Amino acid sequence: MNSDQENINSYNFESIKIGDYKCNVNRIPGDNLYLLSNFNDAEPKYDDKNGVHLEFNYKKIGESKTMRLNDGATSTVLIEGARNMNANEYFPKFVEKKKSFAEHLIRKTFAKGYESPSEIQALVVPELIQRKDTLIQFKSGTGKTHAFLFGCLWGFDPDDDVLQYIFITSSHEVATQIYEQAVFLLPETAKIALCIGQKKSPNSFGNSGFKTPIGTSSLNHKPKSIKEEREEIRQAQIIICTMGRFYDILCNKGWITTTRYLKAICVDEFDNIVASKTKQRSSTVMNTEDQMAEIIQKIESEAPKNSENGAQRVFFSATVSPYAIKIANSYFRKYSPIIGEPFIVLLDSEDYTLEGIRQYYVQCSNYFEKKEIILDLLKQCRIAQAIIFANRIETANEIKKLLDEQEVPISSAVFHGDLPAVTRKNIHKDFVENKIRLLISTDLTSRGLDVQGINVVFNFDMPDTLETYIHRVGRSGRYGRKGVSISLILVNQNKNEMEKVEQIDNCSKQSKMSQLPGDLSTLL
């Protein structure tokens, strides 16, 4: 952990290694660290000695650990007459009801293809089940989406019609991926709303020839009128959304009746949302950091006055800046015996980049040489699927034009934030389904895009920050697969981007950048 990360100096951090990852985890001295070795162990049990608990069986070492569930975890379901029950009456009923849902969640997890928990899932799921506030930094492509969905939604009650969970992320495409995974995991009766911005279509006409009001969100992948959209949001048990759109429906439109019974607010790509260096498009639009602060404030103001729980705060990101750590600390709930200390995981500062990804660079003297080299690389590399990253929309468009003019035989599309939402959605869908093999993209796809077929990432332009580089590179080599990144480095009298190569190498003990070899036949 570096000196900047240590600005949370009130916590005790312990250095641990889980799998191939070295992490710094805050622990109270003497407190147990529970690791989920099998998803079946998330099924709750009850006995007089341990109360409601999870039993973790570590077959490899022939040991087991019992994690007693706290009051926050055991208050996540509606049970008729619960107020008049004592603990011996309530807990067996809780376990009976929660066990049924947990079995469903576990069964769907196996059906999704997860045979055993990944490192991040093993580390984080037990703490999320205990409803701990969390700040989790872990590398891309390690299963973090399933970690926060499984851990948070363990507390979901299908019979409770109130808004229980909010999942926020930074882009339409990532929100859609989270939504689709949540729909797969949960019972069909669960009311889940996908709430993302969508430009109005100029060709939407009713039978009379006049334009029909269309909601600016896409709920359940179907166009909705504003009235239909508002009603679905009001009835939702779970909302999965982009930051700006959620702020609009909560703070501006007031479509969410109450957050009083909210169990958790989970923010993916937290660092990007609260510490983004992206300039605002308009001075009249709040940045996402200010929107996040107002959302947290509103949730706190609506929480029951006599409640020690409140909404759990869950923050995930592949990179975490010192400023994001400071903001997360200010959002965490105040300590109480029920809530406990927040659970914070920070990667070792000297090993941020993904293992399994071979990183190469090619020196270029100017923009025109870059264009020649990218054409050569596309002809020589055996590409399953790939992304070419550019820093500007204009550059992305020029690359696409170049590929079309040169008739490069790889299906491709340009992808950036100025495209209409429907166009972005269709391109994203075609890329996921491998109908498009190559995206020429701005940093819109650098975070959270989960396409397992990507085996190479090209940096046509080097990004401005190390964090963005890490996110870009993380699009390949997903879930332990092998991947390659190739960066075009400008070296001339005016600019020497080899300094960025040195910075990348300084932040990774095991994975270094090297000059691209002449023979690319064995590269992929």
Swiss-Prot record:
- The EC number(s) this enzyme carries: 3.6.4.13
Write down the superkingdom of origin: Viruses
Q: Where is the Helicase ATP-binding domain?
A: 125-338
Keyword annotations for this protein, in alphabetical order, are:
ATP-binding, Helicase, Hydrolase, Nucleotide-binding
Residue span of motif DEFD box: 268-271
Q: Which GO terms describe its molecular function?
A: ATP binding; ATP hydrolysis activity; nucleic acid binding; RNA helicase activity
Q: Which family does it belong to?
A: Belongs to the DEAD box helicase family. eIF4A subfamily.
What is the name attached to this protein's record?
Putative ATP-dependent RNA helicase R458
